[in-house]
């Protein structure tokens, strides 16, 4: 039985009895999992490799639907609807719930066009409006001052840390309500990692954030709530300080203290 804190706040998402099985797999990667996600807070998911945390993260905006024959059941509630139904508009969903991947994924186009890409998909064609929204997004991602004089340059000429902030700018440009971060700093140097962590904390005021990380120190630094997963199950979810200082589950304590990993 999982230990899950009662969150007396508005919820960005709520998961109920969610189970996910990859195509051709015999055992679910996520098993009957339930959890709330607090609105305008940062929730970290930690646990050893293969525990199901990235599988769960990618379920929040149905990224698994890009591949056939995966199976899922249960509910993931967002804006008072179960997003797992066949009626869900996945393009709209992925605008409302954006994702930042482990490896920076700058598109092979200019810096400006990278950020404008999603805006154009939304039907925004007016150049003045596009320019304003692109500038705002780049400022929100703390990269405007570094790129404002080279917006027409190829985005792949940016450093790794800059490309990751560009990806964040591209995601926030379409004004999502939730952002999903999948190991967003694992490919970056310590200085770039610090910058991304500061940015994630700043973004919390505008969006709800869920971050998967193998770095427990990172989870402790940036998150408000932390969930520990093991073998596809949520073992414990609580306030981050309590999870790291006074965990209620023995398995959580053993993982936090490095007895396994």
UniProtKB/Swiss-Prot annotation:
NCBIfam families: 3a0107s01c2 (TIGR00972)
Identification of the protein by name: Phosphate import ATP-binding protein PstB
Domain of life: Bacteria
Record's function text: Part of the ABC transporter complex PstSACB involved in phosphate import. Responsible for energy coupling to the transport system.
Keyword set, alphabetical order: ATP-binding, Cell inner membrane, Cell membrane, Membrane, Nucleotide-binding, Phosphate transport, Translocase, Transport
GO molecular function: ATP binding; ATP hydrolysis activity; ATPase-coupled phosphate ion transmembrane transporter activity
Main location: membrane
PROSITE patterns noted in UniProt: ABC_TRANSPORTER_1, ABC_TRANSPORTER_2, PSTB
Pfam families: ABC_tran (PF00005)
Entry EC no(s): 7.3.2.1
